[in-house]
């Protein structure tokens, strides 16, 4: 992460326990392997940095059923259960919450091998009574007589008090019972997440973030929270994906998008004034390069831009065209390769960063495509210049 985009890391003072969002899957795998012999992980990070999404994706890929407790929204009864009088024994019994993995033995034995993952989200924003109930879950793996399944994996996430989310500082009792990871936002992490078909990002957003990752011209969370006015939108991973990307998908063409007088305002409304203005300018300059269809037809000889950021804009415009057919895809891939200077191109049949971006985007956007390799082979066969 460049110095221009590292303001968020100052919140962690470059602590030794600081990791990237890209590291979350590996961290979860290590804790899952150790299971009950290891303290549960607590993932602390800026809001909108894809903590929950990363956990959900890991759970789905590793055979876990995710039970999410959004703790700020819950009362004590939601965790402890609701009291039901046992008149014969003259005691109060608590009926367990059906949304939590309470039960005897192993969950996997009766659920086709699937294991339960109890995700305690927004732990640091929970009320004190709920926080204390959650602490018993973490410490004793039970609340009263209600016991978690033996194979339950507990994971928690939240924000720190410095992040201006209304979070509370951890108590020593919680800090002593959890493995705490401070997670910094990662462009590469969100790009990898957005490349999945279920999380498909708009090509312009992906290209802009790719350009930032390659050139260091900004990144995620460029607004310092210490200077934030409390009113302007923030350029988080959530803002780019669920805000800006979803908004851009409403346009039918680049011309329609740039012809909208409110386009810059819409961009700023989703990711903040600074990031939104830069994004709108990135799109405008990329489109001004020329007619992308003419460039594709003359892929081997047309002029290409020299500005690294604008090159990513051209690559973004290739995505929708490349998915038309394999012949067009081959030409787009030739053009994508030419965006990388000859001296920096890999030898043989290895892809450049632009070719990799284009191929992944096309495979993600085109469900008719069988595999990445089918497109790759077709492209290699369509033009001998691919290896030059």
Residue ranges of each PLM-predicted region?
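C-terminal regulatory/interaction module of P-loop NTP-utilizing enzymes
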Residues: 2-388
């Amino acid at each position: 992460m460049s110095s221009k985009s590292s303001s968020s890391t100052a919140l962690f003072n470059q602590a030794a326990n600081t990791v990237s969002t890209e590291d979350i899957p590996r961290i979860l795998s290590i804790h899952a392997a150790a299971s009950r012999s290891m303290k549960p992980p607590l993932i602390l990070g800026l809001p909108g940095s894809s903590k929950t999404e990363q956990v959900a994706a890991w759970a789905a890929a590793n055979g876990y059923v995710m039970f999410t407790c959004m703790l700020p929204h819950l009362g004590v009864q939601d965790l402890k259960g609701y009291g039901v009088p046992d008149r014969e024994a003259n005691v109060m019994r608590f009926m367990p919450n059906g949304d939590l993995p309470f039960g005897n033995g192993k969950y996997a034995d009766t659920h086709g091998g699937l294991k339960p993952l109890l995700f305690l989200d927004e732990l640091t924003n929970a009320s004190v009574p709920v926080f204390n109930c959650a602490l018993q879950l973490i410490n004793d793996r039970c609340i009263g007589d209600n016991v978690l399944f033996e194979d339950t994996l507990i994971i928690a996430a939240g924000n720190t008090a410095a992040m201006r989310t209304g979070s509370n500082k951890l108590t020593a009792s919680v800090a002593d019972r959890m493995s705490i990871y401070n997670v910094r936002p990662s462009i590469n992490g969100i790009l990898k997440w957005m490349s999945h078909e279920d999380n498909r990002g708009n090509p312009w957003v992906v290209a802009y973030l790719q350009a930032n990752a390659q050139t260091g011209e900004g990144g995620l969370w460029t607004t310092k929270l210490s200077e934030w006015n409390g009113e302007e939108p923030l350029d988080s991973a959530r803002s780019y994906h669920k805000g800006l990307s979803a908004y851009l998908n409403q346009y039918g063409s680049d011309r329609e998008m740039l012809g909208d007088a409110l386009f810059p305002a819409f961009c700023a409304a989703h990711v903040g004034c600074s990031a939104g203005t830069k994004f709108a300018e990135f799109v405008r300059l990329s489109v001004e390069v020329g007619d992308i269809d003419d460039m594709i037809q003359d892929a081997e000889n047309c002029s290409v831009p020299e500005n690294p950021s604008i090159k990513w804009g051209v690559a973004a415009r290739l995505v929708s065209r490349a998915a038309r057919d394999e012949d067009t895809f081959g030409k787009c891939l030739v053009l994508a390769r030419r965006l990388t200077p000859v001296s920096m191109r890999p030898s043989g049949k290895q892809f450049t960063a632009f070719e990799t971006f284009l191929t992944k985007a096309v495979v993600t956007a085109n469900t008719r495509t069988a595999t990445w390799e089918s497109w790759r082979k077709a492209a290699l066969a369509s033009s001998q210049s691919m290896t030059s």
